[in-house]
Amino acid sequence: MIKTEEKYAQLRTIIPEMRRVKRIHFVGIGGAGMGGIAEVLVNEGYRLSGSDIAENAVTARLKRLGAAIFIGHSADQVEGADVVVVSTAIDASNPEILAAQERRIPIVRRAEMLAELMRYRHGVAVAGTHGKTTTTSLIASVYGQAERDPTFVIGGLLNSAGTNARLGKSRYLIAEADESDASFLHLQPMVSVVTNIEADHMDTYEGDFEKLKSTFVDFLHNLPFYGVAVACIDDPVVREILPRIGRKVVTYGFSEDADVQALNFEQQGYSSRFTVRREGMADLDLRVNLPGRHNVLNALAAIAVATEDEIEDEAIIRALDEFQGIGRRFQQLGEFTTTAGEVMLVDDYGHHPSEVAATIKAARSGWPDKRLVMIYQPHRYSRTRDLYDDFVEVLAQVDCLLLLDVYSAGEAPVPGADSRALCRSIRQRGQLDPIFVAEPEQLQTILPGVLQGGDLLLTQGAGNIGALSRQLADAGLQFESENQ
């Protein structure tokens, strides 16, 4: 067996180091995507530093790995850097960006750095409006089970690995491809996955859905002529663009014309069972440790990629069956005894109407007898404005709704696109009387009067609601007002 040190030495001969680059500085290092790329780079031996406005689990992990972490932004923090990597959330007036420009230090977006990592590897890039993180995690798990030892960069915590990024010793790199700013066009993978295409981040595409679709076509044409596009044919927009793709295409879905087709879907609580049919191969009866039809589609993408790479079926079966999930993707935080009775707490990152609808459907299918109580935090005023009617329709489908204020993500408020407006519009439908929660602290007094024994309490959104959900779990859903 080759020793670890020898394996890394072999890896360096395949993947050349970036010329002249010794120290890399990240601005906005605490984000999952930025932190994942940073973790791979620090493990490759680069000197790493980074800044963000607050500490979190990502910055703490990077600090343990030896990165220099600064809280707050200051011009002197880029001193000595050979390149500065910026997140899409960073404004051009940031003092570190201005200082880098003054010093003629190259400034690159995170996707450009990811592309550099992928340049000499066998890249698998996962794009789409929804399901990227879960699909990327499933592919990484299958490749790990098959002992392919991949490098991966994921937008969420892969529970089995305890991290969202890892430097492997093979030629494989599996990563999410971010369409939010069209920066996924920097990537040149060997395999590209498109899970679905819906209207989101439309400011990037000047409000033009045709431009968004064309950008996905361009992304798939970044594949070499011997590359493979793996596409969900159940999605109508993906199906629509397929005739424009001049590369080999493998389709997946529940549709009869899918190359990798799911049959006999059945949800059993947190897990899903289904049969996979592939042309010229034996059917596979599978269980994936994830709930919902949408997660079966994510699993099909992983199966399609693995099958194309001739990974044995046994590794696919084991990886899906033993999958331990991803942080904040229908993550069950526990069942707690409250004064009202037993309450199950689940946390989910979904923040687009289609994602919220899929989460609600999975909850209803897996736990049909439970009342569904949702605490929802809208993410970005622009998204709330652009998809307002869709949000009103989907949020009205729960049994009890508590709406936190919009998590702005740095955006200025948009009149008529806030949580108070959503409450009014949902109430006018006559199905539900939502509760507006101006400050998260108010949940201490509101929840005891809302929860009932047997409820499924779902915290939903992409802002800081994940931290709130963990606080609720840490407190065991016990509230100060109950003990007074």
Swiss-Prot record:
A GO MF label: UDP-N-acetylmuramate-L-alanine ligase activity
Main location: cytoplasm
This protein's pathway: Cell wall biogenesis; peptidoglycan biosynthesis
Domain of life: Bacteria
Reaction(s) the record says it catalyses: UDP-N-acetyl-alpha-D-muramate + L-alanine + ATP = UDP-N-acetyl-alpha-D-muramoyl-L-alanine + ADP + phosphate + H(+)
Pfam families assigned to the protein according to its UniProt record, in alphabetical order: Mur_ligase, Mur_ligase_C, Mur_ligase_M
Record's keyword terms, sorted: ATP-binding, Cell cycle, Cell division, Cell shape, Cell wall biogenesis/degradation, Cytoplasm, Ligase, Nucleotide-binding, Peptidoglycan synthesis
Subcellular location: Cytoplasm
GO cellular component assignments: cytoplasm
Residues annotated as binding ATP: G128, T129, H130, G131, K132, T133, T134
UniProt cross-references to InterPro entries, sorted A to Z: Mur-like_cat_sf, Mur_ligase_C, Mur_ligase_C_dom_sf, Mur_ligase_cen, Mur_ligase_N, MurCDEF_pg_biosynth, UDP-N-AcMur_Ala_ligase_MurC
Claim: Cell wall biogenesis/degradation is one of the keywords in the record: yes
Coiled-coil segments: none
GO biological process, one term: regulation of cell shape
Enzyme Commission numbers on file: 6.3.2.8
Listed NCBIfam families: murC
Role description: Cell wall formation.
HAMAP family: MurC (MF_00046)
Family: Belongs to the MurCDEF family.
The name this protein goes by in its record: UDP-N-acetylmuramate--L-alanine ligase
Source species: Shewanella loihica (strain ATCC BAA-1088 / PV-4)
Protein encoded by which gene: murC
